[in-house]
Amino acid sequence: MSTELFNVADIFGENVFNDTVMQERLPKKVYKNLRKTIEEGKDLDLETADVIAHEMKEWAIEKGATHYTHWFLPLTGVTAEKHDSFISAPLPNGKVLMTFSGKELIKGEPDASSFPSGGLRATFEARGYTAWDCTSPAFVRQDAGGATLCIPTAFCSYTGEALDQKTPLLRSMEAINKEALRLLRLFGNTTSKKVTPSVGAEQEYFLVDAEKFEERKDLIYTGRTLFGAMPPKGQELDDHYFGTIRQRIASFMRDVNIQLWKVGVPAKTQHNEVAPAQHELAPIYTEANIAVDQNQLTMQTLKRVACQHGLKCLLHEKPFAGVNGSGKHDNWSITTDDGINLLDPGKTPHENTQFLLVLACILKAVNKHADLLRESAADPGNDHRLGANEAPPAIISIFLGEQLEDVVDQLISTGEATHSLNGGKLDTGVSTLPELSKDATDRNRTSPFAFTGNKFEFRMVGSRDSIANPNIVLNTIVAEAFADACDILEKADDFDLAVHDLIKEYLTDNQRIIFNGNGYSDEWVAEAERRGLPNIKSMVEAIPAITTDKAVELFERFSVFTKAELESRAEIQYEAYAKAINIEARTMIDMASKQFLPAFIKYTKTLADTVNAVKAAGVDASVQTETLKEVSALMAETKAALDNLVKTTADAAAKEEGEVQATYYHTEVVPAMDALRAPVDKLEMIVDKEAWPMQSYGDLIFEV
């Protein structure tokens, strides 16, 4: 384990072409033009781009870079990149020059035909464009392949449709910026020039030994275990959560931090999570589009560094049954360029009219578009988490906490809030411990969308998913609520009276979305149904939300998605679900046919030989006989379930692609998979460990 000392401040951002580097290297005029583009969206002329490209190239070469790539996030959900070297055509003397033009910086042309488009373009229509997102800084990534200049970009088709997640995210950020500024102007704010959603993503993950990982085909092919009985101990003692970090894991975390700090990712918090072998990394918040890029970098770094330590990083939402899965809490707030957090209630929120209007608008947005918010977290792996007493339920609700709920209740009942509850002081009863300031409200870990002091925490997002989609939805639905409020208030004769009436109206009309209780309880499921809140339990049931008339009207109004782009994304998600379940089913078939059944057959022969030997010795063989009967019965159940899964999977493959096929995989193939797993997991508790064909749960999660 490396123990070399270093100063974080010295290495932080050393491989980022950030504002400090640009100020040092770019001519003053060029730097000012670029800042105008970043801050005000002004066009960047090619002459300026040429200068930036040259300096960026020179800087990258000094860092050892030989190639550059337009780094983008297509609809596969993972980043994509094509590497080009800086060399030009060889000169007559056989030498080469290292070149990089403004045109190469601003635009790239990857082949778009092999990326998901959901019917937006035919396979033969191959041209696509990447466009430089200058608001997210370029960086040099150093790995086994050398050093590469990575330029964050958006990705679109030849005809302009978004083929990525960055483009609609940037559109949604522009929408909320415009509408939030309208709202601020109503309150007399003339100084703020820009409003930006600020995001921080808490990343959960598992680590397992690489050699043990390689023995599990299910982990290799699907990222999760498809078979596996629980060991005698799981997470019931709560001794792993915040426990002492093992030396091997601590060494891994140290190297992850170093790699992230060098590329400007402000990794802040690390700890053991609830499940054995589960951990979390959380950064400091930043602008939404940068946070999306940094989270993708974080996931890549976790995987890459794990391999260097003889580990494998599992980002699947549910790699192991019986213990908690992994999520990604998306912490979201709205801040101005001059430091105002629109979600900061202050010490007396009942007097903070601007905050109360923002809060009322968010309640309206989430209540109206709960289905869209749920869909933004839809993922095949997340189907195993949501509503399973380890993650938020699949029902969208908002937790406000005691203080804000009290203010809301006052406003709804009387139209006026006269006081705010305070947290006060916490006396521990120990004279040597300091008196602590108590927060005005507790936390609620069971809520999918919780207010946590000066931000909202959306807890539904899956651990391996990009945070782009949830933030696209959040930005857009809140922009709509702001716009609706501004349309009313800008026409009001008496602003103060109108804004108080509007706050009361929004709070009253959307009160059903507020729930401060236990989201894991059956009582809440029943109560949510009485309130008319949607309970969307699966990805397949969630997808239709993005193509409703309501969704199309919303996204087209703010130019975030066209109807065609929404329909294409729905098609892509149905296809992704079907493919994911198909791969899982085929993997189960392969493992059952080639590993489990052969192992069971050998074991029954061993048992049968033992029974015969014991009987021949003239002693009681009832225990051996009973075990043989039990194993044989479960083996027969396994074979019948395997045959059924083979047939069901073949039937699914023959279905019409899209919603029909995805629905069949969900309703027929998934239950058939569960039916195959059940007898195999029972047999794992009976069969001799030496005869078991792969690493057990105990081996994987306790021997790291």
Language-model features: locations:
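Short, compositionally biased "basic patch" segments
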Residues: 1-9
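Glycine-rich, acidic/polar active-site loops that bind/position phosphate-bearing ligands
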Residues: 126-315, 324-327, 334-571
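Hydrophobic/aromatic-rich, well-ordered segments within soluble, folded domains that form packed cores
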Residues: 65, 69-71, 294-308, 334, ...
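C-terminal amphipathic alpha-helical interaction region
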Residues: 508-704
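Active-site core of metal-dependent hydrolases
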Residues: 11-126
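Short linear, low-complexity motifs centered on an aromatic residue
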Residues: 77-93, 110-113, 118, 216, ...
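Composition- and surface-driven signal marking solvent-exposed, interaction-prone regions
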Residues: 220, 295, 317-318, 344-348, ...
